[in-house]
Amino acid sequence: MFKPVKHLIQQSLCLPLLTLSMVMPASAAAPYQAIDYVDAEFAVSYNQAAAGGTAKLTIRQQHNHYDVNFNIQHSLLKARQQAHFSAKGCDITPQSYSASTEATFKGKSQEKLSFNWADKIATRQDNKDGDTSFQLTQAYYDPISLYFKARCDLMAGKQQLSYPLIYKGKESTHRYQVVGTEKVNTGMGEFEALVVERQRRNKNRRTTFYVAPALDYLIVKIEHRESSLATVSMTLKRMDYRLK
């Protein structure tokens, strides 16, 4: 069934824009380098036509602690995601995550997720679902810190990725696979990108990330296909970044 653009853009907001000199093939390993900061802007399109919205990403690092902000502005939707976590090399430890969405005719939704690793418990607060707690029995991620771990694994040359996380109030596992490479046109030029697909049970839905080795494994495009009639994508317009 066809879904309106505001619904699809809202779905795409669950796909944070991270997580990731010479272009190298997918099987090659690259030495890991941590991110110091990122300022990026993405254009939003619906069925390959401009949707009149932009998404902005900022990443800031201080003493191996990261603050990430992702904002989208659209005539039908305003949304924001924030995350704070620590990183020692590829060991990513989430501390907090929050998300808010305000859509036309749908009101506002708010979610906060806090990780207490000393007591091994995570607490989720949601203005619609109430409070929920989770036992941290393993290295869980939130929807943003997950992509920093994925960037490490892609730089190591991994082809199949799997991560436990707390997502939409539930314990879940997200799986991804590198399916090839593709050239992507962006506001900064053309880049050869690794094509990373999320593995889903519903084959009609498809989420694809395009990760550019030439830009130190940062994402240059995200595409979410809800059905054969509806696809939302976010493509890099500009980016300024630095590695540590």
Where are these regions (language model features)?
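Hydrophobic, well-structured mid-protein blocks that either form specific transmembrane helices
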Residues: 107-153
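Bacterial N-terminal signal peptides
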Residues: 12-23
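Acidic, serine/threonine-rich low-complexity disordered tracts
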Residues: 29-117, 156-244
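N-terminal secretory signal peptides that target proteins for export/translocation
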Residues: 1-8
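Signal peptide processing junction and immediate N-terminal pro/mature segment
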Residues: 24-28
